[in-house]
From Swiss-Prot:
It comes from Drosophila pseudoobscura pseudoobscura (Fruit fly). The gene is Arp5. Residues 373-383, 417-428 have a biased composition (Basic and acidic residues). GO terms for cellular component: nucleus. This is Actin-related protein 5. It is found in: Nucleus.
Amino acid sequence: MGSPKRVLVIDNGSYECRVGWNNTKEPALRFRNVLTKPRKDRKKEAIPDTTDGAPTPVAAEVPAEIQVGNDITNIEAVRAHLKSPFERNIITNWNHQEQIFDYIFTKMGFEGEQSIANPIVLTEALANPNFCRQNMSELLFECYGIPAVSYGIDALYSWEHYQNRRKKVSDALIISLGYSTTHVIPVLNGKLQLQHVRRLNVGGYHIITYLLCLMQMKYPVHLNAISISRMEKLVHEHCHIAVDYREELLKWGQMDYYEEHIMKIQLPYNPVTATNALLTAEQKLEKRRELAMRLLEIKNRREGEKLLEDEQQLFVYNKLRQLYEQDKLQKFELALAQQQIGNLDELDSLISTISNRIKRIKERPLSSPKPSKQQEKIDKMPKAPEGVSQADWLAELQSKREQLLQRKQTRQQQRQEQGKRHTHAAQERMRIISTLARSEKRRKANGEEEDDGFGMNDNDWDVYKRINRYNDDSDSDADNEQLLEFEKILSHYDVNFDDGNAVQTQSAAENYQLHFGVEDIRVPEILFQPSMIGSPEAGLAELIAFVLKLFTAQEQQRMVEHVYLTGGCAQFRGLKERLAREFLEMRPFQSKFSIYESDDHTLSAWLGACVQASQPNFGQTLTTRKDYQEHGSEYFREHRASNLFYPTPKD
């Protein structure tokens, strides 16, 4: 088969799907590889008066359309209902995959055509099972009628794109960091060493989920506000990989470093404005009245809508009753079945129930706001005397209030002074009371003087507190009542009045802030330490060392001279430097290695597939319909960027 002019290239990733033509510089379609089916919507329809007398149902079930990728307007609102064709990086749900293909071909201009006339380049998982490829080939050839397909691995396509822009090399160690898994892929002499590939079951999905759990545990009050979408944005824009994780942790333990590098994320909230906080009693009452009026309007409108719906339903049921009275029994039975009504008695019962409900609604008067009980309290509020302005009256009340506060403070200070041992007042009272006690003792002892040891025990001094505790209760209670009355009047007439008892609370904005600090390095660290999420697998550095040990020293050196990073997680800042440190530790002394990365980690696989689709020998990589019919659905043609074909053993 010769090289076709236009090839449809589909990078079918588990996180994002990219679709476009091979002769373009970027994909025409990019979307999240998920779909959802919204809840069914009951839409009301008009009830025409048909000529045959058969009524139309008041409400009909309108089937909900499946939304795919970019058609999902609010992905967080339907997060619980999102579906994916993937289980990790393997396609397992073929109904969902078919719906995604329908979306792709519709957006790419194939809507209404009987078959797809262009060949397709499609990415698949590394070591994709034959069963999955068999289902994919059957779907493409049988359902969509494509002429040919070429399967390839996204990481190898990305490597082809990198080589196309630079020099060609035949040996490399490709590290593919995907959404669900991470692979270490050795390539020798231009061929994939599939038997030595190793996989780490940690990817972008696990990083995002780990951050979600950490933030929800850290801020349980904002559980609903900490969503997956917000965590994805934090991971994509702010997380980075530490070159020395332990050293970075020690830095975050220092308060100065924490204050300098902490990132505060403001969650949405409804602030309390100063205008609302300084409203007078009349203004607050007016706002409550307006709110009550709005609620009553909503209630009356809903009752009106319910009344209209009942009248329409009653109209339909009366039409049904007329069919029975006109002896049109066949139409009557059909209409009953459409309305899901069992028999005539049930119909009469529904007519009676709806009629009574309509009658009650029409007889009931519209709700009106009740007179507020707060108005009586406002009317009883003291007012300025005749001949005195309100401003002068309030100033006089403020002056009297300050005098009461000063008197109260003086009494409090005196009470505290009397309770202390070393003040002059306490010593004077001690002398007087001690003298009285001795005098009383002498009278009882018939003139004999003796020291009773008063004051040697600290508990003896409590007598002053007991004596002076209630000596001014009557004056204090009267002052407190008068003070409360003054403050009540001042707060009612003066919006700027401050009674001095307001508690300084933390800003509402700060209560809705998330501190994103050590999570910056802690979350992506699970690539190197999967044990942080409870995984028993080795980290990325140990995995690379294990793969290299499967080859000879000369082969190891050839591969580490071209270490290539690809995949979405390869975008983390610091990954290249961290891997350089790990290679320096695991490689022999003074040995050389080089680490490269693509210019665009998310598009490099799609661009590499476009490069292959534009090659003169591209036709040799295509699995045609003839190959599909002759060799079976699991067969495919191998090439530099594809998996290796191992036929399924026959029983």
